[in-house]
Design a protein with these regions (language model features):
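NTP/phosphate- and nucleic-acid-binding module
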Residues: 1-203
Length: 203
């Protein structure tokens, strides 16, 4: 956080040394990539521009941080405290650098678990076509996906499925990975199913 005063040069040197130290670390099998942002804009605008770009960690350093040998750390998976304020944690610089690999791995796992939970919460099983029609007929702006049995039809049978889905503004989205062979009949054709697929609305 530059203040346009005599301390700025020392602060930039402190940050460049931090950047070099971080670049010597590795995480998740890759070298750590650290970018030093010296743009002359408000610190809040700069911070949120990096959050919006998906940076897993935003580091802010001011004069008091430098004097104490610290950095202020904002993790993408913990942006806010319980009181709604920004969760910026002051951390000794050397400890932060040494723990960078573990912190990035922890953030990756945390974001993965959050995304997995959100995905599962938005998938609903459906056992017949009437359930599909009823689900997407509801006044729901975020209907998510339906998990249905599928026989992989081809030719005219597939064309018929596509037309039925199109009438509800739906498409086949994907087949979940790691699924076991399901039992029962395809909800579209009545043939034995070979997998389960997700059906959703295309926007």
């Amino acid at each position: 956080m530059l203040r346009d005063n005599a301390d700025d040069a020392a602060l930039v040197d402190y940050c460049k040394a931090l950047q070099q130290a971080l670049s010597r670390e590795s995480a998740l099998g890759e070298p750590v990539r650290a970018l030093l942002d010296l743009k002359a804009v408000k610190s809040t605008n700069k911070r949120w521009s990096w959050v919006k770009k998906g940076a897993p960690i935003v580091i802010e350093v001011g004069g008091r941080d430098m004097a104490a040998g610290n950095v202020s750390v904002i993790r993408r998976d913990r942006l806010y405290r319980a009181d709604g304020k920004l969760d910026s944690v002051g951390t000794p610089k050397d400890a932060f650098v040494g723990g960078m690999g573990a912190m990035l791995a922890d953030i990756q796992q945390s974001l993965f678990e959050e995304a997995s939970a959100r995905l599962k919460a938005n998938i609903t099983p459906a056992d017949d076509w009437s359930e599909v029609e009823a689900h997407f007929a509801e006044d729901n702006k975020t209907p998510g996906w339906l998990d249905v049995r599928w026989s992989r039809p081809t030719g005219a049978a597939l064309d018929h499925v596509v037309e039925r889905l199109k009438a509800l503004k739906l498409t086949l989205r994907n087949a979940p990975m790691g699924q076991t062979h399901p039992e029962g009949q395809c909800i579209f054709t009545g043939e034995p199913c070979v997998e389960r697929v997700l059906v959703g609305r295309a926007y």
